[in-house]
Design a protein with these regions (language model features):
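P-loop NTP-binding site
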Residues: 1-233
Length: 233
């Protein structure tokens, strides 16, 4: 959240900048808008929202209060400090209690989807881009246009959408922190997982991870003569 408020980039293998290990309420106050947007998005589905504040030993009481207030102001049903790393299960008791309460008070009829499957592929992508990411629109490459047309003609137009984009920003630009405005989602191609039953647009500069290596580990899993599973590790 401090990074979303303008904090320095975090680089793998390097110590965290001081603002992340020392109290900095100014950066945090600026960055909680990102959390509030996530809460707003979750509430679109009609579900209870519980925010887990994962406590680090460097977090201060003032910072924890800022996060909790921002979450509640945005409509979260609760925002609970969780200190399970230091205290084990007991440290997560408050969070667990809040989750149980939310489940008990949740009505199944309240749940709703963001879009109807019957919408066109482009309409579903636009719905996600505008309502979840806050984009002004969507730009489709020529390749994406051709792929969408082919999927629609092949009977895959009603499949749900799983967006593949950077996790560091609501936009396709990983450096655009907070809740960016005035941007468009760029779809450079659209791939299909017909067996699993969804389409996934590739947005901006993002690489996908293969689901299995060239030689998957299941080749080594077997049963020995006593019926024990071997080869898992």
């Amino acid at each position: 959240l401090k990074m979303h408020g303008g904090g320095a980039p975090v680089k793998a293998g390097q110590p965290l900048p001081l603002e992340y290990v020392q109290e900095n309420t100014e950066l945090l106050t600026k960055g909680v808008c990102n959390l509030q947007k996530h809460i707003e998005n979750a509430r679109k589905f009609g579900v209870k929202v519980i925010v887990a504040i994962n406590k680090f030993h460097t977090d201060t009481e003032a910072e924890i209060c800022i996060v909790r207030k921002a979450a509640l102001d945005a409509g979260a049903d609760d925002a609970c400090l969780s200190n399970h790393w230091a205290e084990g299960g007991e440290g997560a008791r408050l969070l667990a209690t809040a989750v149980v309460k939310a489940c008990e008070n949740q009505k199944a009829d309240d749940f709703k989807l963001l879009y109807e499957d019957a919408l066109s592929i482009k309409e579903k992508i636009a719905k996600i881009s505008l309502e979840i990411y806050g984009a002004d629109g969507v730009v489709f490459s020529d390749l994406a246009e051709r792929q969408i047309d082919q999927y629609s003609k092949s009977g895959f137009g009603s499949l749900p959408i799983c967006m593949a984009k950077t996790q560091y920003s609501f936009s396709c630009d990983a450096s655009a922190k907070g809740v960016p405005k005035g941007f468009k989602i760029t779809v450079r191609e659209v791939r299909s997982c017909a067996g699993a039953g969804f389409l996934y647009p590739i947005c901006g500069e993002i690489m996908t991870i293969p689901g299995l290596p060239t030689r998957p580990g299941f080749f080594d899993v077997d049963l020995d003569e006593a019926g024990n599973v071997v080869g898992l590790f």
